[in-house]
Regions:
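Mature extracytoplasmic or otherwise solvent-exposed domains
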Residues: 29-198
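Serine/threonine-rich, low-complexity intrinsically disordered segments
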Residues: 6-9, 25, 41
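Bacterial Sec-dependent N-terminal signal peptides
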Residues: 15-36
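Sec-dependent bacterial lipoprotein signal peptides
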Residues: 1-16
Length: 198
């Protein structure tokens, strides 16, 4: 007799768990896989040369003065990637790219209005990128300068151009980032350096 009384309770609990208002990973309003602060490297880099050998000119390698090729996601979710030099590339140019994708809630405020009461708020996804074509020096060494991107470098918008957009504190998420170095003459997608998350 007890088991027949529990069936309606179990059905009700199941219905509540499956409702649109139930808390689930897809209904929390933030990306499921955001990138945490930390240091990231190319998992496919050859430990001796520091790069993906198959995707670089024969004999290419990090110089002895170079530290590891790495990108650091800082606590403010900006990204800083290290400088390094690759010797043995001959006259082969390379294309370097650092791109990050973010989500945030943007609060639009009227200048002089109380910033705790935004006029309008909206969630947005945006990206910021830095890229360059690099040419090796006369000795066949490619110097790759430090690169960085920040979510605060990207201009945000509001429906009214007189309103001031501001990223709401605590709402910023780094969804993904990709740092890549591609040598001319190699197939698209074959990178000598590739650091990406997630």
């Amino acid at each position: 007799m007890r088991s027949t009384r529990l069936i309606p309770v179990a059905v009700l609990a199941f219905a509540v768990a499956c409702s649109d208002t139930a808390t689930s990973p897809t209904s929390v309003g933030v990306p499921l896989f955001d990138v945490a602060a930390g240091t990231y490297t190319d998992p496919l880099a050859d430990p001796q040369t520091g790069i993906q050998d198959a995707n670089a000119p024969s004999g290419a390698h990090l110089t002895n003065q170079s530290g590891p090729v790495q990108c650091v996601v800082n606590s403010d979710l900006s990204i800083s990637c290290s400088a390094y030099s690759i010797a043995g590339v001959g006259n082969t140019n390379a294309f370097l790219s650092l791109e990050a994708v973010y989500t945030a809630i943007i609060d639009c405020n009227n200048p002089g209005n109380n910033k705790n009461n935004p006029i309008e708020s909206h969630e947005t996804t945006f990206s910021t990128e830095e890229s360059a074509t690099l040419t090796p020096g006369r000795n066949g060494t490619l110097r790759v300068g430090a690169r960085s991107v920040s979510p605060f470098d990207e201009a945000q918008g509001c429906p009214n151009p007189n309103w001031q957009p501001e990223i709401r504190e605590g709402s910023l998420e780094l969804v993904s980032f990709t740092y890549s170095l591609h040598f001319d003459g190699f197939p698209a997608g074959d990178f000598a350096v590739l650091i990406e998350q997630p």
